[in-house]
C-alpha cells in the first residue's frame, strides 16, 4: 500500500472510531502531510488550493480548473481522484456537511477531528523521516552558505535576500525568516528583517519548507573580536538547549523539557525569568510549530516526532530540528561545513567568527 493510501486508511480508522461517514480535510499542514506535496498558491495564507474528502469507500480532491492540471501533474499521488470546478465556483457545494462528517476545520456543522488528524501526522513514517533529513540538511547548508558571504556593513534585508536565494536554489521556500543585527538582537525575539545594518553580530533563524515538511534552524555570525563574556553567554544558551534535549524523551510530557529549561537558565547565568521572554519551542513538521509547549502541557512526546526547541537570551539563540526515537533524539539540521563544538556529547553549531 502506498504512503498516501496508508494515511487515508488511518483517517478511515478515525471515522470508524467516531462513527462518522466522511472526513473533509482543509488545513494546509494536514493536506501537505497527506499528499507529501505543496498545497498552497500564495504562501502566506492559510487556505489551500484544494480540499480532500475521505469516505469509507472513496477519496477525492476538489479543486478548480486553474489548479487541477498542475496538481495532477506535480503534486497529487496517482491514486487520488480529482473533481474539478470552474474557477468562478466555490468548492463548498461538493463537500459533505453535517454532524456525521468530520473535519479539521470548523464549519457546516461538521464534527471536529482536528486533534485526531494532528495526532496521526505527529508520528512520521520512515519515508517521511528520510525526506525530512534531506530537507533539514539542505536548509542548514543553504543558511550557512549565505551567512559565510555576508558583511558587517550589510543590512538585515540584504542578509535575508541572500538566505532566500540560497534556499530557493535548493528547492526550499521560506515559511519564516528572522534576521537581527547587533542593534536589534537584544530587543526583539521575532526580528523580521529591516534596513538596519547588522554590525558585529547577526542572528538568522529560518523555517524552510519543501513539499510540506518544514525545517527550523538558527545560526549566528560575529565580526571582529568577541569578548569572553559574550562567548560564555552563547555557550550558556547551548547549555540550556542541552538540558532541554536531555529531557526530550518519548513518552514523557512536553512539560518536561520546559521544566528543564526553567532550571537551566539561572544555572547558566541567565535571569531566573529569562524563559518568560520567549516561547521555548514545540512539536513541528508541517508547521513551524504545531503549538508551543509550556509547563502545563500534559501531552506526551511521541515516537518519530519532529520538534524544535529554541532557547534564547541576551541576544543569543540555539535552534535545530530534531526527531525523537525510543533510543534518543536525532538532530536533523546539521551542516558539516559549519563550525561546531561538542555540548553534552552532541555536535552543536559554534559561532561563525569572521
Please place each PLM-identified region on the residue numbering.
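Active-site neighborhoods and metal-handling regions in enzymes and metal-associated proteins
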Residues: 1-354
Amino acid at each position: 500500500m502506498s504512503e498516501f493510501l496508508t494515511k487515508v486508511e488511518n483517517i478511515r480508522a478515525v471515522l470508524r472510531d467516531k462513527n462518522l461517514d466522511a472526513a473533509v480535510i482543509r488545513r494546509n499542514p494536514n493536506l501537505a502531510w497527506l499528499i507529501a506535496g505543496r498545497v498552497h498558491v500564495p504562501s502566506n495564507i492559510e487556505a489551500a488550493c484544494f480540499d480532500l474528502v475521505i469516505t469509507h469507500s472513496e477519496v477525492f480532491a476538489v479543486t478548480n480548473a486553474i489548479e487541477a492540471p498542475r496538481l495532477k501533474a506535480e503534486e497529487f499521488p496517482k491514486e487520488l481522484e480529482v473533481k474539478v470546478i470552474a474557477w468562478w465556483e466555490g468548492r463548498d457545494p461538493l463537500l459533505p456537511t453535517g454532524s456525521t462528517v468530520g473535519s479539521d476545520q470548523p464549519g457546516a456543522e461538521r464534527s471536529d477531528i482536528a486533534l485526531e488528524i494532528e495526532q496521526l501526522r505527529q508520528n512520521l513514517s520512515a519515508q517521511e523521516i528520510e525526506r525530512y533529513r534531506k530537507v533539514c540538511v539542505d536548509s542548514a547548508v543553504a543558511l550557512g552558505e549565505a551567512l559565510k558571504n555576508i558583511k558587517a556593513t550589510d543590512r538585515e534585508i540584504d542578509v535575508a535576500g541572500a538566505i532566500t536565494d540560497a534556499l530557493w536554489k535548493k528547492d526550499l521556500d521560506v515559511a519564516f525568516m528572522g534576521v537581527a543585527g547587533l542593534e536589534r538582537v537584544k530587543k526583539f525575539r521575532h526580528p523580521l528583517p529591516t534596513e538596519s545594518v547588522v554590525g558585529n553580530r547577526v542572528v538568522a533563524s529560518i523555517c524552510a519548507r519543501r513539499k510540506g515538511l518544514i525545517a527550523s534552524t538558527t545560526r549566528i555570525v560575529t565580526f571582529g573580536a568577541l569578548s569572553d563574556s559574550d562567548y560564555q553567554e552563547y555557550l550558556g544558551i547551548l547549555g540550556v538547549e542541552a538540558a532541554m534535549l536531555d529531557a526530550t524523551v518519548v513518552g514523557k510530557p512536553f512539560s518536561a523539557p520546559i521544566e528543564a529549561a526553567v532550571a537551566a537558565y539561572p544555572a547558566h547565568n541567565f535571569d531566573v525569568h529569562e524563559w518568560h521572554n520567549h516561547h521555548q519551542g514545540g512539536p513541528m513538521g508541517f508547521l513551524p510549530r504545531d503549538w508551543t509547549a509550556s509547563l502545563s502541557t500534559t501531552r506526551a512526546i511521541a515516537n518519530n516526532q519532529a520538534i524544535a526547541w529554541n532557547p534564547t537570551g541576551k541576544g543569543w539563540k540555539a535552534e535545530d530540528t530534531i526527531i525523537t526515537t525510543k533510543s534518543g533524539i536525532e538532530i536533523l539540521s546539521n551542516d558539516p561545513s559549519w563550525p561546531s563544538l561538542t555540548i553534552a556529547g552532541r555536535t552543536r553549531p559554534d559561532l561563525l567568527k569572521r
